[in-house]
């Protein structure tokens, strides 16, 4: 190896380590996301159970679904930035690792394989937290849509009964 090639390899190693550490910054956020998802899930389950048991939808239920939706979207906005950065940094790490063009030496493990085996589980954890957050946001959105549909049907029923009573009054007056 000449000095130029050695310098490039050292630079690649430094870049790999820097971007790997930057990607791992999302791991605490992913752990926090998983714990918050449990809380959000319980709140959503309670709201859905209340929706199923309620004969009429009240303003408190509508307010709770709106609050939960707001909380999930707010937390999602905070987490997405970090999760997106992790994805980008992980791609850079993979790119830099492939640029090393390692060759296997006897029974020794390549450094790229070593890094990958220790780095990818963390990246997959972040991706799983992001996926679960997306699924929860979708479920909250569906619950909100269902609640809005229920309110709309109730309003239509009220309007129909009002029209019926108005017709009866008009018939009585004639």
Enumerate the predicted regions with their spans:
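Membrane-associated alpha-helical segments
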Residues: 69-174
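Amphipathic alpha-helical surface "interface" segments used
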Residues: 64-68
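Extended alpha-helical interaction modules
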Residues: 1-63
